């Protein structure tokens, strides 16, 4: 039965949530409080209190129906009246007569908060707009202010490649943290005070264009350009997806378990685990090492020949730029004719059991090419009626971002990828950016998709990639892309991860999607000292990544090659976990362990090989436990611990056995890697 609430602070939906696939004790309770003005007062989880900053729960931008550049802002606190109704399952907050660009009585806003059986809450926002002039463009919702006190909380935020980083005791930052969706980064944010945590994630099965914004005192919200933004009479009434808040107990792993339970039910994961996909090219997930080159066919064949001699026990993959007639980031998508000898190089390398993987770009068209005269209408159109153009480095010509919904562009990509498969005989291809670059709002009505935001970006890529993916897999060939964009999971077979590694990285994507795709590469400066090199590469190995994306001079470093031989051999013996299994947790110690600090030098790009004056970016310093390990569930359901001694000294540690209250002792010889059965 509905009831009108009184003007008093109201605690709603006090509930207990159980973590997904969690150990004993991973449960917590969440209480959310508002005042009589519908201002969020706090969110209490266990013994911790989050989001005490008050302020507007939502803001929105509206544009003039005849001029998208003319904007006004609507804010919750400006409403003439605020009301609230409650049932056992839903709380409804209403703001009536919100001023809009000088008009009154034309805008209402409604937030519904739905209690879910698992203890989470789904928050939705919708507007009723009666203005004849102003049309909804963007929303920022829900706005949680001062989620954790300055310097008090650990904050999990999205990052490139691995998917997330953990910021310990995060303080107020001078610059806003903003990440865009449909690219590298998942839309996630987690906040922890001790072992009490708050899960803050949009659940959007359609994968609409959106941003996460965190600024100031951990003030967080999700920004959305709505469908048909600024189109009078057609603009969406709001973001059209819920943001889910849930209580957590533990650390970022409890967050990842909850997200995995959601993510694996989405359309991009519908194919299921790769072990159960009949035409999944298992050759990809069983390649343990990759090299990155910019070189012609003779260079490519020589490098893979040397790699075969140095790493005889397994295949080496080659991320191959310059197989095409022109340079990198030049003359896209006019890749053909191929360099003389490309077809023969591919056949020769494949005959050795090596994997040459040509590079193409599935997103960009070089604007100076004559072909762009005809292609320009299919590029993304900005709000100011100019085409969206990017530039990569001062020597690179402008590159236009193509709208993935346009059939002519889809046909172009199908054509050049088909020629690489059929004419060159390649068994693998790297299609750059479709899994890394974020969705871009497009305002060209000729493209036929909703203007501005919406789900059309993913839908366009899916329509483009489905026949390409089917054709390649039918021949036992595989497709990869850059980054780790989850929305491409059913469009590609794996993700090449090229971003510089950081001590704050956590293996979020591996924890969520392990067993459902292949993540490969572990970029590192080849000049790192051997101990630092071993530490980073072992971390990546135990998280489930195949290793590599090294510059070819790695082959001139016997000490690094010896380390890689050892690590890759271990991976090949544990493919049931590292390629086909599920990453469960990290090795947790029952007694203190030694730690070592390593220097990871700044990235060396390929052109630094020929530029003695190249200046490295700053180093990063990582302090890691001397013994590392991760728990995995293998493809056949066994729980195992994979662990390594990073040091040249024997190590003895006492650790907690996953899923139990037991402890055990592990003694490791110098640089030893082991597999241990779980409980």
Set out the residue ranges of the language-model regions.
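Aromatic- and glycine-enriched glycan-recognition loops and surfaces
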Residues: 285-381, 411-415, 456-466
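Bacterial N-terminal signal peptides that target proteins for export
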Residues: 1-10
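Active-site-proximal substrate-binding groove within the catalytic cores of carbohydrate-active enzymes
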Residues: 36-37, 225, 236-242, 457-660, ...
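Conserved beta-strand positions
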Residues: 318-321, 431, 481, 643
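Carbohydrate-recognition beta-sandwich/jelly-roll modules
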Residues: 25-317, 335, 348, 352-355, ...
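Active-site neighborhood of glycoside hydrolase catalytic domains
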Residues: 401-491
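Bacterial N-terminal signal peptides
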Residues: 10-19
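Active-site-adjacent "subsite" loops/lids of carbohydrate-active enzymes
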Residues: 340-348, 354-424, 501-517
């Amino acid at each position: 039965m509905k009831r009108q609430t009184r003007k008093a602070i109201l605690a709603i939906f006090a509930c207990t949530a159980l973590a997904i696939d969690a150990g004993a004790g991973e449960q917590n309770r969440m209480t959310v409080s508002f005042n009589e003005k519908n201002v969020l007062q706090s969110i209490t989880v266990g013994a911790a209190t989050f989001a005490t900053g008050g302020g507007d729960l939502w803001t929105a931008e509206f544009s003039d129906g005849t001029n998208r550049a003319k904007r006004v802002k609507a804010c919750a606190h400006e409403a003439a009246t605020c009301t609230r109704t409650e049932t056992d399952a839903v709380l409804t907050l209403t703001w009536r007569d919100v001023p809009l660009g000088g008009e009154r009585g034309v805008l209402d806003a409604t937030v519904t908060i739905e209690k879910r059986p698992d203890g989470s809450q789904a928050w939705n926002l919708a507007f009723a707009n009666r203005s004849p002039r102003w049309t909804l463009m963007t929303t920022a919702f829900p706005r949680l202010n001062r989620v954790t006190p300055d310097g008090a909380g650990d904050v999990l935020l999205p990052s490139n490649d691995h998917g997330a980083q953990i910021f310990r005791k995060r303080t107020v930052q001078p610059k806003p943290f903003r990440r865009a969706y449909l690219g590298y980064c998942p839309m996630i944010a987690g906040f922890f005070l001790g072992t009490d945590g708050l899960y803050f994630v949009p659940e959007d099965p359609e994968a609409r264009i959106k941003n996460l914004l965190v600024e100031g005192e951990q003030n967080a919200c999700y920004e959305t350009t709505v469908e048909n933004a600024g189109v009078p009479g057609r603009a969406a009434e709001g973001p059209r997806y819920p943001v889910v808040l849930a209580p957590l107990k533990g650390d970022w792993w409890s967050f990842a378990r909850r997200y995995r339970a959601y993510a694996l039910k989405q359309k991009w994961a519908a194919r299921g685990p790769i072990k159960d996909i009949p035409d999944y090219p298992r050759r990809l997930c069983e390649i343990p090492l990759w090299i990155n080159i910019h070189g012609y066919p003779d260079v490519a064949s020589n490098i893979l020949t040397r790699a075969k001699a140095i790493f005889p026990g397994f295949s080496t993959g080659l991320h191959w730029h310059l197989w095409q007639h022109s340079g990198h980031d030049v003359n896209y998508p006019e890749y053909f004719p191929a360099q003389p000898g490309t077809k023969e190089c591919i056949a020769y390398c494949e005959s050795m059991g090596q994997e040459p993987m040509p590079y193409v770009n599935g997103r960009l068209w070089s604007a100076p090419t004559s072909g762009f005269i005809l292609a320009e209408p299919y590029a993304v159109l900005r709000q100011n009626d100019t085409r969206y153009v990017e530039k990569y480095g001062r020597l690179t010509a402008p590159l236009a971002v193509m709208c993935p919904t346009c059939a002519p562009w889809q046909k172009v990509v199908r054509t050049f990828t088909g020629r690489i498969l059929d004419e060159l005989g390649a068994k693998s291809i790297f299609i750059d950016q479709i899994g890394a670059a974020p969705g871009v709002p497009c305002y060209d009505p000729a493209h036929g998709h909703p203007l501005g935001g919406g789900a059309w970006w993913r839908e366009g890529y899916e329509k483009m990639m489905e026949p390409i993916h089917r054709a390649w897999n039918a021949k036992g060939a595989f497709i990869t892309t850059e980054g780790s964009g989850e929305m491409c999971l059913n469009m590609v077979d794996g993700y090449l991860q090229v971003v510089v590694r950081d001590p704050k990285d956590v293996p979020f994507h591996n924890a969520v999607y392990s067993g459902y795709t292949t993540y490969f590469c572990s970029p590192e400066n080849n000049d790192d000292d051997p101990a630092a090199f071993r530490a980073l590469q072992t971390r990546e190995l135990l998280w489930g990544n195949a290793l590599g994306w090294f510059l070819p001079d790695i082959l001139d470093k016997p000490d690094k090659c010896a380390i890689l031989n050892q690590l890759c051999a271990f991976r090949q013996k544990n493919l049931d976990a590292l390629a086909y299994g599920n990453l469960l947790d990290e090795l947790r110690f029952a007694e203190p362990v030694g730690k070592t600090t390593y220097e990871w030098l700044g990235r060396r790009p390929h052109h630094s090989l020929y530029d003695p004056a190249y200046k490295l970016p700053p180093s990063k310093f990582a302090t890691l436990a001397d013994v590392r390990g991760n728990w995995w569930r293998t493809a056949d359901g066994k729980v195992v611990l994979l662990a390594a001694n990073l040091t040249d000294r024997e190590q003895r540690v006492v650790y907690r056995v996953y899923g139990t209250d037991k402890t055990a002792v592990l003694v490791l010889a110098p640089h030893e890697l082991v597999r241990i059965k779980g409980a």
